[in-house]
Amino acid sequence: MNRFQLLSKGLRLIHKMSEEALAGVPLVHISPEGIFKYVMINVIDGGDASKAVIRGFADCTWHADIFDREEEVFKKLGLRAECPGGGRIEHNPDKKYLKVYGYSQGFGKADHAQTKRILATKYPDYTIETSDEGY
């Protein structure tokens, strides 16, 4: 096997590994209850594949704190991350209710309709509302 064939084989293996890493990334990871900031993150493998995920944590003061935390996780998996926007989530598990609203001063407003669709994959029995009102 020549150098080019070895390099090509190695790149295919790396690409396959990053595809598998991307497939293993959960679509939703948010705090179990409360009102907190969230970001939408586009997670990208070594090729052209990507997926949008939602992350929101009550212990993060800023949208950038959420993104920075998750970006480190994705880097360790060989994945890249971009943040198209954020907002806030109100999560009431007793009422099976989620509200997506507001925006991020640093990243701008996420597509709340897309956020709702992604949240519904983890919370199919919840009422999920969106609003462009509020911060």
From Swiss-Prot:
* Keyword DNA-binding on entry: no
The record's annotation in Pfam families points to:
Ocnus (PF05005)
Residues recorded as binding substrate, renumbered to this chain, are 37, 104-106
**Gene Ontology biological-process annotations:** cell differentiation; sex differentiation
Q: Where is the active site?
A: 63 (proton acceptor)
Of the GO CC terms on this record, one is:
cytosol
State the protein's purpose. JanA and janB regulate somatic sex differentiation.
Membership in a protein family: Belongs to the janus family.
| Protein name, as recorded | Sex-regulated protein janus-A
- Protein source organism: Drosophila erecta
Q: What is the lineage of its organism?
A: Eukaryota, Metazoa, Ecdysozoa, Arthropoda, Hexapoda
